[in-house]
Amino acid sequence: NTYLWSEAVETVGRHQANIVAAVFGKGAAPIDSGKLLVKLCASCCRQENVLGVYTSGTVFEPSFYLRSALVMRDGDLPVLDWIYFGLYRSDNGISGYTYGLENFGKREIEVLDSNTKPVELRDFLFNIAYYILDNDMEFHDGETIGFSEHQKLPITLSAGVAVDGMSFKISYRKKPVTKSK
């Protein structure tokens, strides 16, 4: 199931075979192994009859996967090929989570009950995941994070809501706009 590709179930339901791709490297850095796996899968996406790429708990459209892999040409990380960014409505707003950070030895991230738009929350989660992977970051319970000098978003470690195990929760809410008189 994916909000990125509405025809995913119908399309991949027609598959007649599959290829399992994996990269094993004793002592290899997870980022390097991940890049190699993306290159391998992206080359498969160039084949005429490929229907989808299953990774990070979802199916990606081959053209999306390939476009997302091409960022490596500029030295960027193919985070969209590694991490799924799940979004769902909750009683108090929109919530989101990552799925795939554990493949790099990192805890998954969740944002609960945000008052942002879904695309803003997805972009926020993307930026956090990219930051974690690009800088080999480790969060700790009680820390804060921000993308500006004044932004301090609390980080807590607790049982996952949308993901298994423990996850880091980041409180991400926009301040209400107050109208001046």
Language model segments and positions:
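Aromatic/basic-lined ligand-recognition segments
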Residues: 58-181
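Internal, hydrophobic cores of structured domains that mediate oligomerization or house catalytic pockets
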Residues: 1-83
